[in-house]
Amino acid sequence: MFELLGTTLPSRLLLGTAQYPSPAILADAVKASGTSVVTVSLRREMAGGRAGEKFWSLIRSLGVRILPNTAGCHSVKEAVTTAKMARDVFGTSWIKLEVIGSHDTLQPDVFGLVEGARILCEDGFSVFPYTTDDLVVAERLLEAGCRVLMPWCAPIGSALGPVNMTALRSMRGHFPDVPLIVDAGLGRPSHAATVMELGFDAVLLNTAVARAADPVGMARAFGKAVDAGREAFSSGLLEPREVAVPSTPIFGRAVFS
């Protein structure tokens, strides 16, 4: 179980709902992953018309919590407007805030992100900010009212996995009591297990599952990897050593002369 902003969640895996081959495969992947939170783009809902209505009905039928996002927004005004519309459409104050600064890398505009987070937090939103692994930016987001942070481990959709382990370790150590959810850049179940072993509270991913040859199987694999990584962290991992350490005791050995 995972306590997140006063809500008990059975799974530490959050799953995106875009790019799946079909609605049926999306539904099966969500079920196979064990997730209890899915992200949904308001832009998709508004642009989809009748298809968007069917998609929304499908998501509701899965019985999972909705985390709307402001994907595709490149300005504070656009992101704030989208967030407010999402609250009306989906009936939740949770919002994954994205303010994109670069078309090429999809790197967040951290200045706009902090400004947008402050506006939305003051308006009663629970903001999940998609951010970098920069500690100063993280501090500013917390000062703005955020109670959870969502640092990337690599650019969105890159599947590179954690490219800066030192930064991720520093973030976990610097914010021991803040829920930290790794968002973006995970490509393999082993990547998810790795960041969970660092002590991160959860992961959010989309492309690695949606564009896999078998999305349902990959969703199941990620669910198991997240659980394994968390259990490993909770059980106490051994620190790496530069020298060999015998696993067999040397006491009581026979001595031949």
Curated annotation (Swiss-Prot):
Which pathway or pathways does this protein act in?
Cofactor biosynthesis; thiamine diphosphate biosynthesis
Q: Which InterPro entries match?
A: Aldolase_TIM, Thiazole_synthase_ThiG, ThiG
EC class (word): transferase
Annotated keywords: Cytoplasm, Schiff base, Thiamine biosynthesis, Transferase
Q: Which residues bind 1-deoxy-D-xylulose 5-phosphate?
A: 157, 184-185, 206-207
GO BP of this protein = thiamine diphosphate biosynthetic process
Reaction(s) catalysed (UniProt annotation) = [ThiS sulfur-carrier protein]-C-terminal-Gly-aminoethanethioate + 2-iminoacetate + 1-deoxy-D-xylulose 5-phosphate = [ThiS sulfur-carrier protein]-C-terminal Gly-Gly + 2-[(2R,5Z)-2-carboxy-4-methylthiazol-5(2H)-ylidene]ethyl phosphate + 2 H2O + H(+)
* Molecular-function annotations in GO: thiazole synthase activity
- State its location(s): Cytoplasm
Name the Enzyme Commission number(s) assigned to this protein: 2.8.1.10
GO CC entries: cytoplasm
Where are the active-site residues found?
96 (schiff-base intermediate with dxp)
Function recorded in the entry: Catalyzes the rearrangement of 1-deoxy-D-xylulose 5-phosphate (DXP) to produce the thiazole phosphate moiety of thiamine. Sulfur is provided by the thiocarboxylate moiety of the carrier protein ThiS. In vitro, sulfur can be provided by H(2)S.
Recorded hits in HAMAP family, A to Z, give:
ThiG
Subunit info? Homotetramer. Forms heterodimers with either ThiH or ThiS.
Family, per the entry?
Answer: Belongs to the ThiG family.
Please give the PANTHER family that the UniProt record associates with this protein: THIAZOLE SYNTHASE
Q: What is this protein called?
A: Thiazole synthase
Q: Which organism does this record belong to? A: Mesorhizobium japonicum (strain LMG 29417 / CECT 9101 / MAFF 303099)
